[in-house]
Amino acid sequence: MSAQLQHVSVLLTEAVDALAIKPEGIYVDGTFGRGGHSRAVLARLGAGGRLIAFDRDPAAIAAGQAIADPRLELVHAPFSEFAVVLDRLGVSAVDGVLLDLGVSSPQLDDASRGMSFRFDAPLDMRMDTSRGRTVAEWLAEASVAEITEVIRDYGEERFAYAIAKAIAAARTGGAIATTGQLAAIVEKAVRTREPGQHPATRSFQALRIFINQELEELTTVLPDCVARLSEGGRLVVISFHSLEDRIVKRFLRDEARPPQLPSRLPVRAADLPPPRLQLVGKAQRPGEAEVAANPRARSAVMRVAERCGVAA
């Protein structure tokens, strides 16, 4: 891997520690990336352990082929297919799941992926380049209302409507085909600037999240993870922006909350099912040293939960 396309795993030791790995256990890395977390998990597994690693990016799967370890099973699929893949592999329960969300450094730093406004490249943004629409294809057909909704909801951008109108006006003169074109359009439409942040940051984030259905993927996989965890198994999730973390925080909180007693019904608390999860510690963020060494770690938040008793 070239130096430019290296990926530094965030909260590496903390995340693997949080999995509380059993040497002969079965674990899932939902986002293989360049294998930083997976390698650390493999280092703690015994000869009978097993790691199933997902990634929807063909480049990540190709990079993973360099790991010659029979305990590792690489799966080219989004983690929303977690349950289907485990069924296919004959795995009914796992001892831990790690989800390192968001976009990887190689995806951002490879100009050909079209995810960053730092390069003028084809406007793609797909994590899985083998299927689905590119951002350029979607922008060519989307209405002003649809573009506004995506940029507002997924980018939390207050100038979403102005940006959407500018995109619609610009495409009348020809397709918006490159990241440079889009960044210039957004830059002109944003009337005020946030210190230290490019005007197109929120819009690019929004379009990437939307085109890859990142939040829908997350909402799908979380309950599937809990359903497959064995008793005492850990779910470890690292989020990188508030939209992701909000979903994770709410899900874990709800799963760890005891069920409410129905009002006016003769039901005892002992008759209700226990919560499926128990929260483990508080949300954890990278320390100053890690952020200094890897500035992209600054927004990371790690949350951990453990599976409570599983009914026979």
Curated annotation (Swiss-Prot):
<dbReference type="InterPro" id="IPR029063">
    <property type="entry name" value="SAM-dependent_MTases_sf"/>
</dbReference>
<feature type="binding site">
    <location>
        <position position="79"/>
    </location>
    <ligand>
        <name>S-adenosyl-L-methionine</name>
    </ligand>
</feature>
<dbReference type="InterPro" id="IPR002903">
    <property type="entry name" value="RsmH"/>
</dbReference>
<comment type="function">
    <text>Specifically methylates the N4 position of cytidine in position 1402 (C1402) of 16S rRNA.</text>
</comment>
<keyword id="KW-0489">Methyltransferase</keyword>
<keyword id="KW-0698">rRNA processing</keyword>
<comment type="similarity">
    <text>Belongs to the methyltransferase superfamily. RsmH family.</text>
</comment>
<dbReference type="Pfam" id="PF01795">
    <property type="entry name" value="Methyltransf_5"/>
</dbReference>
<feature type="binding site">
    <location>
        <position position="55"/>
    </location>
    <ligand>
        <name>S-adenosyl-L-methionine</name>
    </ligand>
</feature>
<feature type="binding site">
    <location>
        <position position="107"/>
    </location>
    <ligand>
        <name>S-adenosyl-L-methionine</name>
    </ligand>
</feature>
<dbReference type="GO" id="GO:0071424">
    <property type="term" value="F:rRNA (cytosine-N4-)-methyltransferase activity"/>
</dbReference>
<keyword id="KW-0949">S-adenosyl-L-methionine</keyword>
<keyword id="KW-0808">Transferase</keyword>
<dbReference type="GO" id="GO:0070475">
    <property type="term" value="P:rRNA base methylation"/>
</dbReference>
<feature type="binding site">
    <location>
        <begin position="35"/>
        <end position="37"/>
    </location>
    <ligand>
        <name>S-adenosyl-L-methionine</name>
    </ligand>
</feature>
<keyword id="KW-0963">Cytoplasm</keyword>
<protein>
    <recommendedName>
        <fullName>Ribosomal RNA small subunit methyltransferase H</fullName>
        <ecNumber>2.1.1.199</ecNumber>
    </recommendedName>
</protein>
<feature type="binding site">
    <location>
        <position position="100"/>
    </location>
    <ligand>
        <name>S-adenosyl-L-methionine</name>
    </ligand>
</feature>
<dbReference type="InterPro" id="IPR023397">
    <property type="entry name" value="SAM-dep_MeTrfase_MraW_recog"/>
</dbReference>
<dbReference type="GO" id="GO:0005737">
    <property type="term" value="C:cytoplasm"/>
</dbReference>
